[in-house]
Amino acid sequence: MNIFDELKARGLVFQTTDEAALSKALTEDMVSYYVGYDPTADSLHLGNLVLILTMKRLQMAGHKPYALVGGATGLIGDPSFKDSERSLQTKDTVTKWSGKIRSQLERFLDFENGENKAEMTNNYNWFENLTFIDFLRDVGKHFTVNYMISKDSVKSRMESGISYTEFAYQIMQGYDFYELNQLHNVTLQLGGSDQWGNMTAGTELLRRKANKQGHVITIPLITDSTGKKFGKSEGNAIWLDADKTSPYEMYQFWLNVDDADAVKMLKIFTFLSLEEIAEIEEQFEAARHERLAQKVLAREVVSLVHGKEAYEQAVKTSEILFGGGDLRQLDAKSILTGLKAAPQHQIAPDEDLTLIELLISAGIAPSKRQAREDITNGAIYINGERVQELDYVLTDSDKIENRLTVIRRGKKKNFVLTY
C-alpha cells in the first residue's frame, strides 16, 4: 500500500485536486509539501495534531515537509467559515507565538536528518518587503473578483460583511504556495477541509504565474459519532502545551472517547498499523466494557505528545485518584487537575477542627449525626486512607504540599480542602 492509499484508508483524505497525478508523484518521487500554521494562539491543539501527524506520515514515507508559520497571514486572520472578523494580534505577539509553534513541531517532525529533513519558514520573509503596488500587479491581477467571491469560505460571510483585509487572505495564502514552489520546489499543500478555497487559490496562482501544477490534499473535519467537532473537552480545546492541557487531562480525554469513535481515532491519531488496529478492533468489539481501544488511544497519543514518562504518570495519577490509593504520592497540581470538578472548601491553615466539625463545615455531611455515622461506618477517607476516629484532627502530614487535603465520602464523592 503506497502512502496515498494509506492516508485514504485512515480517513485522512477529503478532497484532492488531481488524485491520479498526486498518487503517481507520491509513489515515484520525493515530494516537497507544506502545511501552514497561523500563530493564532500560544499553542497548537488537537485539531492541528491531525495535520502534524499527517505531515509525519508523509515524511516517514520519504517526502519532505515544510512547516510554514504565518507570521504575515497571522497578522491578518483567516476568515474561512468564521462568523465574524478575527481580533488582530500585535506583531510581537505573533512573533512570540510563532516560536512556540516551532518548538511543538520539533516533537513530531525530524528537522535534523536526511535529504527529507523538515524545514520551517515564515511567510513574513516574503511579505515584509512586498509593496502594495507590487502585490496588486504581480499577484492580484491573476485573480478575478468573481473567482474570489465564489469560494464557500467567502460566501458564508457576504451577508454579515467581510473586510477587504480578510477578503484578500486567500490571495496571500495562494502566494505562499507560489513562493514555496519557487524557493523549494514545493508542489503539495495539506490543510483542513475548510481551507479548500484558500488552498486552490495557490494552485491557480501557480498555474497562471509559473505554468506549473500544484497539488492539494484536504483532511476532513474530524467529528465524533454525533457530528460534533472532535478535539474539545467540555467546550475547551485540548492543547499540545502541557501547561494549558496537562498530560493527565489529555489522558482522560482519550479514555472517555465514545465507543463509536474509538477505532476511527486510532486510525487518525496513532502510528499503529492498520493490521494492528484491526486486531484491536476485534478484541474491542468482543468486550467493549474493557475499553481496550480507548486505553490504547490514551497510551499512544499521550506518549506521542508528551512522552512515555508523562503517560505513565497520568496512569498512576488516575489509578490513585480513582482506585483508592494514597494521594500523598501525587503532587498538588496533579490532584487539583484530576479533581477539578470536585467541590472545594477553603479553611485557615491553623484551624484545628475535629473531623466531625470539618465534615459539617465543608458541607460533606449535613449534620453531626450523619458525620458520626459516616466515620463509624468507614465511609470517610483522608487522602485515600480510611479514618474512623470520631475526634480525629488533621495534622500537617495530611496537608499535601501545605496546599490541600482530599476528603472522600464513599467510593466516589471527593471534596478538596484548600489552605
UniProtKB/Swiss-Prot annotation:
CDD domains reported for this sequence: S4, TyrRS_core
Residues annotated to bind ATP: 232
GO cellular component: cytosol
Single GO MF annotation: ATP binding
Chain positions of motif 'KMSKS' region: 229-233
Top-level class of the enzyme under EC nomenclature: ligase
Name the UniProt record assigns to this protein: Tyrosine--tRNA ligase
Organism: Lactococcus lactis subsp. cremoris (strain SK11)
Gene encoding the protein: tyrS
